[in-house]
Amino acid sequence: MGAVSAKYRRFARIAWGCAVRRVTFRPCDTTFKQDLKDHLLAPIAVRTPRLVKPASVGLEVVAWLVILTTVWSGYTVVKSGLNLYVYGTCNKENAESCTLGAEACAIPDQTPTFWGSIAEFDVIGAFGNEFASLGETISQIPTRMQNWDATEYLPANETYLATFDEAKPTALEVIDPGCQFCRQLFANIEEAGFENEYNLTYVPYPIEGEDGYKFPNSLLVTQYLEALRLSPADDGAGTSGADTEPAVAGDTGTPVDWQVLERIFTGETDNGVPFQSRINGLDTDAATALLDGWLTEFGLDADEVATIKSVAASDEVADIIAANKELVEDEIHTVKVPTIIFDGRRHDGLVDVDGLK
């Protein structure tokens, strides 16, 4: 009020002087509170004396609300800043809601929100979850300064987009086959020639939602990818030379799981619809038939396709997917997909072409 009204500027100067003394741990030697209250209540006392007491109470309530709002706003700014530094998003519970970070598909936090808990009259839980979340963020600050080595986070039976070269550094990306930003990252990787400079591998991570998965067929595609990684092949191109090597079909020397990803991320239907959008809109049976057709197109025979389909539904693949979930959430600690680790850094969200060069 002091900024726009001359009659309140005296109070503004007194208030700032008092604030400075408080910050420097000195007593506030002014009757500012009472002076301001008297100034505001004087017109009411003249016109309607009986309203002075309730108006005084109202001023106290408003004053406390202003204080609480200021404190909460300051806390929110600090928390958002820490989240932006650590996770690349000002809201780690819903990374997509923050426009300051890189574009990404959010990994939702299943913990009840502060106001959600308040609405359920769980005050203790609201503050407990809030400060636990802040504590977790603070504990992750060192990860922004650490040297990230992609080889320390490799999944089981990893495959590589190009032929593995021990002379090249390794890069690891966390992807959800249904996430549109993973598709954009793949396009940027190809445009930058990233796979020619790094041994690029991936962790398939289907993002869970409140009811099932964020993208309906992400789990199905992930099951097929892991089954393909488990399937033996005579050709070791695109692998690190593990005992169990993934299927490699055709003349490209590219593992079939990568061929599936490339089809999803870069291919289109005859009508020009991206295959990723197509798969996201299909029911399970139709998506399964589409994947089986691709495997046949990539050179697998009927028996091999049947084997892949069986392995995809196995407990072994389920265990691998569970291990990948733990890897992403508890070791990599990202809240955004895609996430890519290379050159000693963890990059959360979509990385542009220049950032990949």
What are these regions (language model features)?
Residues 183-296:
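Structural alpha/beta surface segment adjacent to cysteine/selenocysteine redox centers
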Residues 1-28:
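Hydrophobic alpha-helical segments
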Residues 4-5, 68-86:
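Membrane-interface motif at the C-terminal end of an N-terminal transmembrane signal
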Residues 24-40, 98-108:
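Cytosolic juxtamembrane regulatory segments of multi-pass membrane proteins
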Residues 285, 289-357:
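C-terminal cap of thioredoxin/glutaredoxin-like
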